[in-house]
Amino acid sequence: MPAAGPPLLLLGTPGSGKTALLFAAALEAAGEGQGPVLFLTRRPLQSMPRGTGTTLDPMRLQKIRFQYPPSTRELFRLLCSAHEAPGPAPSLLLLDGLEEYLAEDPEPQEAAYLIALLLDTAAHFSHRLGPGRDCGLMVALQTQEEAGSGDVLHLALLQRYFPAQCWLQPDAPGPGEHGLRACLEPGGLGPRTEWWVTFRSDGEMMIAPWPTQAGDPSSGKGSSSGGQP
């Protein structure tokens, strides 16, 4: 997962693997020799997400800066003061659980203000990183199978600011394994692509093109054991 690129909105129902993919993106960016990663979430992770493997590189973990703003007000304050933070600028900004912050004040103008702050903060970090280097932005939003009118309004607003979106759908590839189908809409920057993501029993995450896209519809879910795309 690249650290730079257009802002990406990660969408999925509860348990669809949003946090696991955000954490995998953080580990990937932390190992690319770039700046640190800023991971924002409402509360500390209770355990390592799926896909982190049996061993973790301590050097990568040290480059992931976790911040836990407990409310929308505290999140606003953190983002507004980000330009004052000492040290190197992050190469990737992640926010997990956007829906929890939006639920505090469902007014569209508050949601628009929060999104603008996230985009401005990522742009500021990109400026600090220097020419040819950008700070990526990934935001995870939990969706419901039956969305209310407020959820529909929020999603429509978010899609205006995040033309690149990745929809996650959980699925079970086999006993002792967890998997999901990821559909990436790059927002006019390329064709829509679909991927099969498998979390094996040993904790490793495997990614392969969705079988029908790979040109072998008969290959079935077993093809998920292939290598990285």
UniProtKB/Swiss-Prot annotation:
SUPFAM superfamilies associated with the record: P-loop containing nucleoside triphosphate hydrolases
One example GO MF annotation: ATP hydrolysis activity
Subcellular localization, as worded in the UniProt entry: Nucleus
Entry keyword set: DNA damage, DNA recombination, DNA repair, DNA-binding, Nucleus
Main location group: nucleus
A GO-annotated cellular component: Shu complex
Superkingdom, taxonomy of origin: Eukaryota
Chain segments carrying region Disordered: 209-229
InterPro entries for the chain: P-loop_NTPase (IPR027417)
GO aspect biological process, one term: protein stabilization
Function of the molecule: ATPase which is preferentially stimulated by single-stranded DNA and is involved in homologous recombination repair (HRR). Has a DNA-binding activity which is independent of its ATPase activity.
Quaternary structure and partners: Interacts with ZSWIM7; they form a functional complex involved in homologous recombination repair and stabilize each other. Interacts with RAD51, RAD51B, RAD51C, RAD51D and XRCC3; involved in homologous recombination repair.
Protein name listed in UniProt: ATPase SWSAP1
Annotated organism of origin: Homo sapiens
Lineage of the species this protein comes from: Eukaryota, Metazoa, Chordata, Craniata, Vertebrata
Gene: SWSAP1
